[in-house]
A protein has these predicted regions:
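Short, hydrophobic transmembrane alpha-helix segments
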Residues: 1-7, 25-30
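Membrane-interface helix-loop-helix junctions at boundaries between adjacent transmembrane segments
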Residues: 30-105
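Juxtamembrane/start-of-transmembrane alpha-helix segments at the extracytoplasmic/lumenal side
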Residues: 104-105, 242, 718-736
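C-terminal transmembrane helix-loop-helix hairpin of multi-pass membrane proteins
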Residues: 141-248
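Accessory, solvent-exposed terminal regions and/or long lumenal/extracellular loops of proteins
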Residues: 268-278, 369, 422-724
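Surface-exposed, glycine/proline- and aromatic-rich loop segments on solvent-exposed faces
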Residues: 288-351, 411-432, 437
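A cross-kingdom signal targeting lumenal/periplasmic-facing segments of multi-pass membrane
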Residues: 319, 323-395, 585
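C-terminal membrane-anchoring or membrane-association module
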Residues: 740-752
Length: 752
């Protein structure tokens, strides 16, 4: 799952919740066993809220628990505690968010959540609440997605299998203290929450829509309970079995989730006149987003005849002349070179010398890494076709039209009549965009303007518009692409990182020590590393390769090391970052995402959100040079032994990350300094024999070579010399288990 958690935040959430609960329980003379309610709240916050601040988790947990007791004497909760904590974190701190796709869409995940959720709900008599919510929401999504928009069933299945919505349905909306007591009213209320969730998610594109609707609707529950009588639920009067299921189910779900870690298209599709067969196997896109304003710059790697080029891109509004321009393709080279995966070098000091320790970083890592990794390589009128030409423009070397259509068959026929070769499968992909009231940006080359420009290549196209939807329509691009395709997204915001909301956004493995000889093959190494990471994540995740503050006036380090100069004002202007002006100090945050997608694994367009996450990240790999000799002192001999062990780990890392089997070259690398280890001082024999058998990988079969996947997952440090520390995957489960043991101890003590 590769869930990006922080142990400190998890600990703070649990301790704050339990601490506040115990304080109120003491002053209100409530049994200590009520702290299990705080434990459930902690699970909800940990599973659904994201923030890069431990303080936000503590504040959310404290207010979530405290608000329950404000209404204690009225014997009802005004808000679901976890929901209240989540909304407080988002609305008050501006440093928290919800990641709808963080739990993925795996069938096993849904099965786990469903199984344990039903165990809880069947005991607390709230199964109907979850079922009504799910049936209503899933039915509405089916009607809109499949029947109305005419997307294929894979798109629908992807939407409804998001783990976060199942967590919400089975563990949050079903809270018996914040749902109506009357069963029929409760069912209508649950259906209303589902309708509101559907509306906000599909028409206002709000991430975490269910959380917002629940926050607004639970204050109505006391009024509904007053108007429509029903049996009041009371946790204290429930059976021990119910309480046992409630806590154990949530804890098992959390721990299972934590332990489950383990060629490109344009935004549109290329179309060609005559019978030219065009495939676009890579693309780069610049995304700039602030509020509802979006700027998209699309690279152009087309290499065919100019007369055969054309592109179709869905856009949400009719673009005006000033909303379209061409830019220099140099901007993509600048952003790629600056944010690409990189090498960093460290140098050991000879411990036999008394000089101060020297450990410095060089910035001469391969600046063209990303390139080496990514490079592969009877006439009717439009009215009769149901097509409207909303606007036409001449921009740069392109003739551009903005089209709207009533149905896909007519649009396809119109484009064919205009001389475009449309993929056979394009019609089924065009229909959903038409039903969504999207327009179509169509561009082809004006040969006269292109010839007069003096350039023998096509410039990137930049468009800008205002709309609530923040997405890239990749489905249209797959209409004429084969196999897997790569897209690099360079995103700029004022606030923080950009992440995908309908596919998981995961960090590429980084800060890993690899052998010195990896320098000469770094491009191939990173290609293999990405392929293995992509496969490990189920081939349906978006990978983060770089995230950093690049505000021109900011004095902090913008990378470590830098493989090129950071973007300057002219670069920001070219990329469409309109607020990065000479006289402005507004923040600019740069996110680089790498997407490898295919028809089978990415059935939906990419949906994005801007988060307040300002944590810096870069894909970097560490080369550590040995100290120069001689190594005649005891410390020098100990250093040589540790050097050999470290190099063995580096070779293992090279295999685990990139799949490079150890060979004679790696043997030589590991054992390079073994001859010097035989010259130890005689007194060193007191510590054992100084005879050393060189390690030989050739004596081990590939089948028996153990690959420590913890290195790949970032769960374990690979060297004591590494300047970065990784957490193991057991820290949070162990802590959660400790909290459970503490709660059960309190319960037993309270009974006595």
């Amino acid at each position: 799952m590769n869930w990006d958690y922080n142990l400190g935040s998890v600990v703070a959430t649990f301790l704050t919740s339990i601490g506040i609960q115990m304080i109120f329980a003491y002053f209100l003379s409530l049994p200590l066993s009520t702290i299990k309610s705080a434990l459930v709240t902690s699970f909800g916050l940990t599973l659904l809220l994201k923030s890069d601040s431990t303080l936000v988790f503590s504040l959310s947990a404290a207010l979530a628990i405290a608000q329950k007791f404000i209404f204690h004497k009225f014997r009802f909760h005004l808000w679901n505690p976890a929901n209240f904590g989540i909304m407080v974190g988002i609305l008050l701190t501006q440093n928290a968010w919800i990641s709808p796709a963080q739990w993925g869409t795996e069938t096993l995940l849904v099965f786990i959540i469903g199984t344990f959720g039903l165990a809880v709900l069947s005991n607390i008599k709230r199964l109907d609440t979850a079922l009504v919510f799910l049936v209503t929401l899933l039915s509405l999504e089916y009607i809109r997605t499949v029947l109305y928009l005419e997307w294929n069933i894979e798109v629908y299945l992807h939407k409804i299998s998001q783990g976060s919505i199942w967590l919400f349905a089975l563990f949050m909306i079903t809270d018996p203290m914040t749902t109506p007591n009357n069963k029929w009213v409760r069912r209508f209320w649950s259906g209303g929450v589902a309708i509101g969730t559907f509306y906000l998610a599909n028409f206002h594109f709000i991430n975490g829509a269910a959380q917002y609707i629940l926050f607004l609707s639970t204050p109505l529950v006391p009024l509904l309970n007053w108007a429509f009588k029903g049996k009041t639920f009371n946790w204290i009067n429930t059976t021990p079995m119910i309480k046992k299921h409630a806590i154990s189910s949530m804890s098992i779900v959390l721990m299972l989730l934590l332990l489950s870690q383990e060629a490109t298209a344009f935004c549109g599709f290329y179309v060609a006149k005559a019978d030219a067969t065009l495939f676009n196997q890579k693309s780069e896109v610049i995304l700039v987003r602030d509020g509802n304003r979006t700027v998209i710059t699309m690279s152009n790697d087309y290499k065919g005849e100019m007369k055969d080029f054309a592109i179709v891109v869905p856009v949400p509004v009719v673009l005006q002349d000033g909303d379209i321009k061409v830019v220099s393709r140099h901007i993509f080279q600048t952003l790629d070179g600056y944010s690409s995966p990189r090498l960093v070098e460290y140098y050991d000091q000879n411990p036999c010398y008394s000089d101060d320790y020297l450990n410095y970083s060089l910035s001469n890592a391969i600046p063209q890494v990303a390139e080496s990794v990514m490079m592969n390589d009877n006439v009717l009128t439009e009215k009769e076709y149901g097509v409207t030409v909303e606007a036409t423009y001449e921009v740069g070397e392109y003739s551009i039209a903005i089209l709207s259509a009533k149905e896909s068959e007519g649009l396809k026929a119109y484009l064919i009549q205009e001389g475009y070769k449309i993929p056979a499968t394009a019609e089924s992909v065009l229909a959903p965009y038409i039903k969504s009231n999207m327009k179509f940006f169509v561009a082809k080359v004006n040969l006269d303007r292109q010839k007069s420009s003096g350039f023998d290549y096509l410039h990137p196209i930049q468009i800008r518009f205002e709309h609530e939807k923040f997405m890239l329509p990749i489905r249209l691009g797959m209409a004429n692409s084969t196999g897997e395709q790569d897209m690099i997204v360079y995103a700029f915001t004022k606030k923080g990182r950009v992440e995908c909301t309908n596919y998981r956004t995961v960090k590429i493995p980084t800060d890993r020590n690899i052998p010195l000889y990896a320098r000469e093959m770094f491009g191939e190494f990173y290609k293999n590393l990405f392929q293995r990471a992509y496969s490990r994540e189920g081939k349906n995740a978006v990978h983060l390769e770089y995230a950093w503050t690049v505000t021109p006036s900011w004095g902090g380090t913008k990378c470590d090391p830098c493989v090129g100069p950071p973007p300057i004002y002219n670069d920001f202007a070219e990329a469409g970052v309109w607020w990065a002006q000479w006289n402005s100090n507004e923040n600019v945050f740069f996110t680089r995402l790498h997407v490898r997608y295919s028809n089978s694994k990415f059935p939906s367009d990419l949906q994005f959100q801007v988060t307040p996450n300002n944590e810096h990240f870069q894909a970097r790999y560490i080369l550590t040079h040995p100290a120069p000799g001689p190594f005649t002192c005891d410390e020098g001999q100990a250093y040589l032994e540790s050097l050999r062990n470290r190099r063995k780990l580096e070779v293992d890392e090279m295999y685990a990350l990139g799949g490079f089997m150890p060979n004679s070259k790696s043997d030589q690398y590991i054992n390079e300094f073994v001859p010097y280890m035989n010259n130890k001082p005689s007194e060193s024999k007191d510590r054992g024999s100084n005879e050393f058998e060189p390690f030989n990988y050739n004596e081990i079969s590939p089948e028996s070579f153990a690959v420590d996947m913890a290195y790949v997952n970032g769960e374990k440090d690979n060297s004591n010399e590494s300047p970065f520390k990784k957490e193991t995957p057991w820290d949070v489960p162990v802590f959660v288990g400790s909290m459970l043991a503490f709660v059960f101890f309190i319960q037993r003590f309270n009974k006595k």
